[in-house]
């Protein structure tokens, strides 16, 4: 208990809602402390998006939230994060209040509902490319790897037309082989002709004309 109190006291309550790499570590440590105080079961989060880019050192930037694409069970199998456990959401709300984060700073938006990433199918082998971090006895966080970032970022860049995803994708410097694998995976999530057309345009914009022709 004394350890938890020291951790809580050591973390500033003036943390901005824009999350840096240091902020991310503080948030996870505090979340772990909240779970310990509540004596919850162990939770294992599989995280994608900007926070995973930051945590694994693939990009130096900020983010606004932590995107949970899956949970991992005690048998090391990935399972749906929809819905997230109530005890986790309660602890996350306390962290948001303590650190001044957005209310939904920890969310399952990428895999929420029937059309979510988990529900539609994750890239093959994603579980073998995770980077694990342990925060106390009740919180494990697994960050997705570079190849899976390429898959998700290409899909998001086409689906959402968001320049941030395209910027992240360029920073990952994907090869033709990696982009073709990502493109073919993305087309399993949206089989429409319109999506394929925009996907080809995006690949050409990235300078990968041959990939656009191959898919």
Feature locations, PLM:
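Compositionally biased terminal segments of proteins
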Residues: 2-215
């Amino acid at each position: 208990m004394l350890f938890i109190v020291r951790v809580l006291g050591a973390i500033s309550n003036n943390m901005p809602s824009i999350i840096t790499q240091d902020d991310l570590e503080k948030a996870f440590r505090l979340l772990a402390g909240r779970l310990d105080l509540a004596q919850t079961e162990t939770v294992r989060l599989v995280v994608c998006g900007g926070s995973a880019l930051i945590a694994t050192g693939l990009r130096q930037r900020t983010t606004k939230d932590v995107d949970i694409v899956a949970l991992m069970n005690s048998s090391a199998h990935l399972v749906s994060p929809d819905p997230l456990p109530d005890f986790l959401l309660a602890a996350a709300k306390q962290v948001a209040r303590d650190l001044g984060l957005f209310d939904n700073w920890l969310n399952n938006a990428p895999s929420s509902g029937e059309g979510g990433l988990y529900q539609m199918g994750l890239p093959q082998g994603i579980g073998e490319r995770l980077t694990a971090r342990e925060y106390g006895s009740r919180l494990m966080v697994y960050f997705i790897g570079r190849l899976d970032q390429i898959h998700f970022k290409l899909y998001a860049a086409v689906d959402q037309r968001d320049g941030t995803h395209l910027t992240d994708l360029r920073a990952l410097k994907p090869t033709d082989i990696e982009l073709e694998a990502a493109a073919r995976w993305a087309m399993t999530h949206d089989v429409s002709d319109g999506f394929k057309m925009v996907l080809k345009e995006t690949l050409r914009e990235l300078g990968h004309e041959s990939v656009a022709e191959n898919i």
